[in-house]
Structure formats: C-alpha cells, structure tokens
C-alpha cells in the first residue's frame, strides 16, 4: 500500500506524515512531496522512526516521482489561513495549486483514491473533479473532500460539554467544510440531550473552530496539528477500506448523488474501490433541517466557483 502526501513540508503535511509513519500498516510505503527543498530531509527525519513504513521525499516542481504507484493521495498543499482571512480568501492561491497537482495525479496514478485537504474544500474538490473529467479518468467513488476535522472537533466538544468519554462519542457532520456549511447532527448522538441554546452554541463553535485556532495562534499559523490528525484518521480509513476491512465508515465531502448539491458531506462506506456506498444521514431535527436548507446557496456557489475556475 502506497500513500502519497502532497504538501508534505507544510504544517499539516508534516504532522500528517509523522502520524502516517507511526500508524500505517507494516510494509506500507509513504511518499512525501512538496515544492520546498526541505522535503527529502523531512523524509530522512521520519525514516529514523522505528516502524516498518518506508519513507521517501521528493522536492521541486514535479510531483510525478512521488505519485508513481500511489494507492492513496492526500493533498494538503497550499497557503494557510491568517487572521482576518476566511477559507474563501485562500481560493485565489490554492485553486491553481490543486488544479496542477490533480492534473499530475490524473496522468500518473489515475486509479488512486484522492483526499483533498487544501482549503476551501467546498471549492477545491469541485476543481479536482473537473480536472479529472477533462483527463477522462474521473471516478466519483475515488475523490473525497476531507471533512474529518469537523467530525473530530464535534466529538471533542460534545464530550467536553457533557462530561463523556470522547471515544464513545460519534457525530455525523454533513454539508460542506466552511462556516455555515458545516452541520453537526447533534440530535443523533445516542444517550445525550441538548437544550436549544446548547445546540446553537455548539454548532456555532464547531463552525468557527478554525477561526478559534487561527486567532489563538496570533498570526503564527492555523489548525495544522488537529488537521494532521483528522487527515491521518481519514487516510487510514481509506487504506483499511482498500485492504477489504468491513464496515469502515467516515463522513466526507463527495459527489454522492445528494439531493441537496453536486457535492455534499455525509457518511460513506469505504471499500476496495473507494466509496462502496453513500449512506443516508438519517433523521434530523427542525434546527438541523433549517440549517441545512439555509446553507445550500452558499455551498452551491462554492461549487460553481470551482467548476468555473477549470472551465
């Protein structure tokens, strides 16, 4: 099993690479790429960690050597948020980066499962899809927007608020991956009840958690460590699905035939071909239904921005 991380010298990429080096199945290969010349050194650094995962690093303009034979590609390349920026401000820089990298994936590893981490995910996933379509290799079951950070934040914040063991808390998060498009389905959490005020406050905190980190770091970065953990969880789930493990389910932003938008985050069953089945997200509360309906114009506009960028 070969996993490639594109953007591996960045804050998310290095955290993700460290976690994958320590957690990928024995015998896996981990391939790191970044434009930054430090990248082969990141691989050497990681190679000193005693796990049976082979690491190689590649720098420069062309990611092709890193992508050859990849089963899973995780793309975190791009610029990070700074105070005062929202995820859409990132679009102007990151859109071109994602387009160029996905073009290389289409040429080098067209059957790989691709997880897009680079923000704004609502838009960059649509860009990736259009690039893959133009290359004639698009398979909607092999492209994912990684929204796992919203899930782990939801699980953490709910556990803290209710005094629960976080390992026992499971939260589905639907919609998209920025602001109001992030919708945690708090009404579905078993054995927990929330007041209307708690639901509103928790939902808002989850939606704005990225800003919480950006402001707390005071211009020194964004949510790199928690995003690295979230991306590792999702990447390992992709690997487990590819290896034939049963009942591997994660939420992800996918082209899943949603009635709501061309791309929509919801639970998916993972398997040997990527998405085996898009799962229904179930009954929602009135608050959640209203929030879902209210986000759709924003989500659709984000998607259109990506489609138009490629065309």
From Swiss-Prot:
InterPro entries: L-lactate/malate_DH, Lactate/malate_DH_C, Lactate/malate_DH_N, Lactate_DH/Glyco_Ohase_4_C, Malate_DH_AS, Malate_DH_type1, Malate_DH_type1_bac, NAD(P)-bd_dom_sf. The active site is at 177 (proton acceptor). Coiled coil: none annotated. One of its GO terms (molecular function) is L-malate dehydrogenase (NAD+) activity. Disulfide bonds: none annotated. NAD(+) binds at residues 7-13, 34, 94, 117-119, 227. PROSITE patterns: MDH (PS00068). One of its GO terms (biological process) is malate metabolic process. Gene3D superfamilies: Lactate dehydrogenase/glycoside hydrolase, family 4, C-terminal, NAD(P)-binding Rossmann-like Domain. Keywords: NAD, Oxidoreductase, Tricarboxylic acid cycle. Substrate binds at residues 81, 87, 119, 153. GO terms for cellular component: cytoplasm. It comes from the Bacteria. It holds the Pfam family Ldh_1_C. It catalyses: (S)-malate + NAD(+) = oxaloacetate + NADH + H(+). Its EC number is 1.1.1.37. Homodimer. Belongs to the LDH/MDH superfamily. MDH type 1 family. Catalyzes the reversible oxidation of malate to oxaloacetate. This is Malate dehydrogenase. It comes from Shewanella loihica (strain ATCC BAA-1088 / PV-4). The gene is mdh.
């Amino acid at each position: 099993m070969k996993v490639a991380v594109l953007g591996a010298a960045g804050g998310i990429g290095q955290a993700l690479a460290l976690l994958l080096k320590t957690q990928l199945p024995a015998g896996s290969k981990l391939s790191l790429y970044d434009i930054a010349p430090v990248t082969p050194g990141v691989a050497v650094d990681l190679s000193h960690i005693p796990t049976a995962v082979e690491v190689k690093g590649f720098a420069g303009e062309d990611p092709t050597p890193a992508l050859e034979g990849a089963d899973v590609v995780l793309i975190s390349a791009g610029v990070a948020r700074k105070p005062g920026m929202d995820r859409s401000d990132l679009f102007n820089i990151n859109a071109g980066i994602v387009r160029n990298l996905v073009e290389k994936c289409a040429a080098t590893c067209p059957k790989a499962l691709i997880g897009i981490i680079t923000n704004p995910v609502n838009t960059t996933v649509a860009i990736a899809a259009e690039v893959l379509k133009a290359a004639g290799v698009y398979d909607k079951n092999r492209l994912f927007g990684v929204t796992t950070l919203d899930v782990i934040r939801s699980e953490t914040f709910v556990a803290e608020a209710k005094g629960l063991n976080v390992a026992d808390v499971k939260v589905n998060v639907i919609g998209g991956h920025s602001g109001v498009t992030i919708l945690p389905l708090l009404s579905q959490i078993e054995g927990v009840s929330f007041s209307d005020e708690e639901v509103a406050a928790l939902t808002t905190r989850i939606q704005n958690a990225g800003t919480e980190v950006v402001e707390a770091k005071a211009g020194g970065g964004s949510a790199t460590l928690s995003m690295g953990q979230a991306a590792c969880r999702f990447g390992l789930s992709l690997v487990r699905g590819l290896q034939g493990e049963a009942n591997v389910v994660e939420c992800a932003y996918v082209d899943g035939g949603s009635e709501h938008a061309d791309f929509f985050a919801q639970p998916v069953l993972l398997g040997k071909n990527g998405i085996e089945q898009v799962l229904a997200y179930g009954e929602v509360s009135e608050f959640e239904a209203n929030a879902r309906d209210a986000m759709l114009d924003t989500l659709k506009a984000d998607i259109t921005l990506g489609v138009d960028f490629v065309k």
